[in-house]
Design a protein with these regions (language model features):
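Active-site-proximal or metal-binding-adjacent scaffold patches in catalytic folds
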Residues: 29-43, 49
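Short, small-residue-biased leader/transition segments that mark boundaries at the very start
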Residues: 1-3
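Von Willebrand factor
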Residues: 24, 52-108, 130-149, 153, ...
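N-terminal basic, Ser/Thr-rich segments that initiate or prime the first beta/alpha elements at protein or domain
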Residues: 16
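VWA/integrin I-like adhesion module and closely mimicked acidic/polar interface patches used
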Residues: 152-189
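Extended, H/D-rich, highly charged conserved domains that either
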Residues: 8-13
């Protein structure tokens, strides 16, 4: 039996990077339709490699009042760094409480501006099922969803059709019933 002082701590930034890089990696494959030009002059015909780009990444942020500005800013800074490394075609921020209050869309060349230009909205209760409902209503098909919340939900965890990572802030006793859960201690931010 381990006391809470002896339990290993996972760096949430590394865990977040790991989720994004494994879930959202572009598809690499090779094709014989276009031979690799580097070897043709030597008379060797090899397939050329093709990498598909990463599509859209959705970041859904709980704005029910329990997520402070400091945590939000640091989390978005880390997400921005991850997005630069993975290079998704777009990042969509969804601010939610009992409904999606704001939907912001950033193309790949705008990722540096996320922290400076975002305008969080909300402040009501906490009903996360509004996020997958909104995504279905708007026919969004992201490669993955990252949710930042304190885990104190007023309803269910929702039904998700895409890989989902729950970043639960300062609530070690709550684990999402769908997707992967990452617990974050605000003192680590």
């Amino acid at each position: 039996m381990c006391s809470s002082d002896l339990q290993s701590r996972v760096d949430w930034r590394e865990a977040l990077r790991e989720f994004v890089s494994t879930t959202c990696s572009g598809n690499d494959y090779s094709t014989w339709r276009r031979p690799n030009r580097r070897y043709i002059s030597a008379g060797v015909y090899l397939p050329s490699g093709i990498t598909e780009t990463v599509g859209e990444l959705i970041i859904a942020i709980d704005t029910s009042g329990s997520i402070g500005g400091r945590e939000l800013s640091q989390f978005l800074g880390e997400v921005c760094a991850i997005a630069k490394a993975v290079k998704p075609q777009a990042v969509r921020l969804l601010y939610w409480d009992t409904k999606v209050c704001r939907d912001e869309y950033y193309m790949q060349d705008q990722l540096d501006d996320i922290v400076k230009s975002t305008k969080p909205a909300g402040g009501g209760g906490t009903m996360v099922e509004c996020v997958p409902e909104y995504m279905r209503e708007k026919q969004m098909r992201p490669q993955a969803v990252i949710i930042l919340t304190d885990g104190y939900l007023g309803g269910s965890w929702g039904t998700w059709d895409v890989p989902t990572l729950w970043c639960i802030l300062d609530n070690k006793h709550t684990t999402a019933s769908v997707g992967k859960t990452l617990h974050i201690d605000s003192s680590d931010m």
